[in-house]
């Protein structure tokens, strides 16, 4: 269960004011950078990135970006914490239910914070409206 959500770094940049008229909805990416533990608490370092382009083609040029980084704290039993860390170290993945909770939490919080940042520099808000479902690799 997520017990704390912290944003430690926010970046935003536009290439030029003129390019804003051609922006498209951003390409969004959530990366879970690192998973570590402190007793029965897991710390998941993350990066939420929104890349803005001037078109949809492969040769589209970047017109700006938003990047939000931080740490999510998750409280679990000692046994569950050890199990999750072992899985992360071996497969670089998390249990499906935990991954869904983290990704949906990040979508909500980073979309909210990203909207304020995007508005301040003239970019389209990086809103994710639907819930994310995670599936095990087959």
Where are these regions (language model features)?
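N-terminal intrinsically disordered, cationic/polar leader segments
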Residues: 1-105, 119-138
């Amino acid at each position: 269960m997520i017990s704390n959500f912290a944003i430690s770094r926010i970046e935003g940049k536009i290439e030029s004011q003129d390019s804003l008229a051609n922006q498209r909805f951003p390409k969004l990416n959530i990366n879970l950078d690192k998973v570590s533990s402190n007793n029965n608490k897991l710390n998941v370092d993350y990066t939420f990135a929104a890349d803005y382009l001037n078109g949809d083609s492969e040769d589209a040029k970047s017109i700006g970006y938003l990047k939000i980084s931080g740490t999510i704290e998750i409280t679990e039993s000692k046994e569950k914490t050890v199990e999750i860390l072992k899985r992360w170290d071996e497969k670089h993945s998390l249990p499906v239910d935990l991954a869904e909770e983290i990704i949906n939490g990040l979508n909500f919080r980073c979309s909210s914070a990203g909207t304020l940042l995007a508005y301040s520099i003239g970019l389209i808000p990086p809103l994710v409206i639907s819930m994310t479902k995670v599936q095990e690799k087959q």
